[in-house]
Regions:
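Short helix-capping segments at alpha-helix termini
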Residues: 55-59, 155-159, 197-200, 268-269, ...
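Bacterial N-terminal signal peptides that target proteins for export
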Residues: 1-14
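N-terminal signal peptide c-region/cleavage motif recognized by signal peptidases
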Residues: 20-26
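A bilobed periplasmic-binding-protein/Venus flytrap-type ligand-binding module shared by bacterial periplasmic
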Residues: 50, 116-126, 217-234, 291
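Pocket-lining segment of extracytoplasmic ligand-binding domains
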Residues: 92-93, 170-174, 178-268
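Secondary-structure end/capping motifs
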Residues: 230-313
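Short, glycine-/small- and polar/acidic-enriched structural segments
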Residues: 31-177, 181-188, 208-209, 215
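Conserved C-terminal helix/tail region of periplasmic/extracytoplasmic solute-binding proteins
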Residues: 303-338
Length: 338
């Protein structure tokens, strides 16, 4: 009986060990977070890299994988295929995807201002939006074209006759080679590529979408709606936001440090600290809530303005109906604020 008792105890211990290992593995798996970026490693995403590098995610008990984006990577497709828990995306693309059947929900809005603009050479004869007529304009597609199409509709231009659209690659060559009068640029990136290529700022004219009244919200964080029904997911993402906001606050406060971290994360070796520092300084201008308790909070009024812009696209609206409050949630942001 003693021997049988020992065997039974041994078996029980083994079972408990296996169960414990299984539970531990489950807990570990639950702490994993994969975030899909919209583009390649650069200061546009410094907050995530800073949070990773300085151990902020680890301090929250998270194992975070940061997946760089690229010209052939759609954040919407990635999260729809369950290859990411959360994605960085622009609101126009996210709302268009939601209407098309991918139920994305905004859980945080990092960028409060738009950095998108059209950059034109004065020599092309463009000095005001009225001069766009008859001109070739470079436009990014893949979800980035929506703000432009809305703007043209507001101006009363037909994109198939009044202007010529050049589907712009993710470079500034069309402007440098005079293939287009204007091209799409971000204040923190492509605009400076034009300047670095030798074009004097005095020879350029820029049109900020923000100032033209056609800006839509850009870099925000999105998850699948069904996931928000899981309290464990909400808690995990709350920790993710808390650490991410800490990373962004640091990046805004110390652009030079952020630049070094971003360069270290760029496995291609093409990034430079000088360029990334400048980019971070310009990105900081778009995160107006950095350093405050409101960082990452999506203002309902800002959401409504974006929806209004997207619906006002003439015969080709980005979305056909107002998605309503279901398209965003503050539940994760509130969890991060506790």
């Amino acid at each position: 009986m003693i021997r049988s008792s020992k065997i039974a105890n041994s078996l029980l211990a083994a079972v408990l060990a296996v169960c414990g290992a299984s539970i531990g593995a489950s807990a570990s798996a639950a702490d994993k977070v994969t975030v899909q970026l919209k583009w390649l490693p650069q200061a546009q995403f410094a907050g995530y890299y800073v949070a990773q590098s300085k151990g902020y995610y680890k301090a929250e008990g998270l194992d975070v994988t940061i997946k760089p984006g690229g010209p052939d990577i759609s954040p919407v497709q990635v999260i729809a295929g369950n290859a990411a828990d959360v994605v960085v995306n622009w609101m126009p693309d996210a709302l268009a995807a939601r209407e098309a059947g991918v139920p994305l929900v905004n859980i945080a809005q990092v960028f409060n201002q738009s950095g998108l603009m059209l950059t034109c050479k004065k020599a092309s004869g463009v000095s005001t939006p009225k001069d766009f007529k008859g001109k070739t304009l470079g436009v990014w597609y893949g979800g980035n074209e929506y703000p432009f199409l809305n703007w043209m509709a507001k101006l009363g231009y037909k994109t198939d006759s009044d202007i010529k659209i050049l589907k712009q690659g993710f470079n500034v060559d069309p402007l440098l080679q005079n293939q287009a009068a204007c091209i799409s640029t971000m204040i923190y990136n492509e605009y400076w590529q034009v300047v670095d290529a030798g074009v004097k700022e005095n020879d350029l004219v820029t049109f900020f979408y923000e100032k033209e009244g056609v800006a839509s919200l850009e870099d925000g964080l999105y998850v699948l709606e069904a996931k928000l029904k899981d309290p464990a997911f909400v808690a995990r993402m709350g920790k993710f936001l808390k650490a991410t906001f800490k990373g962004w606050n640091d990046a805004v406060k110390n652009p030079a440090e952020a630049a070094k971290i971003v360069v270290a994360a760029d496995t291609s070796g093409s990034a430079s600290e000088k360029v990334q520092k400048r980019q971070m300084e310009n990105v900081a201008k778009l995160i107006t809530n950095a350093g405050t308790a409101k960082i990452g909070y999506l203002e309902p009024a800002a959401f409504e303005r974006t929806v209004k812009v997207l619906l006002a696209a003439g015969s080709s609206p980005v979305i056909k109906k107002d998605p309503g409050k279901a398209a965003y949630s503050h539940v994760v942001w509130e969890a991060a604020s506790k």
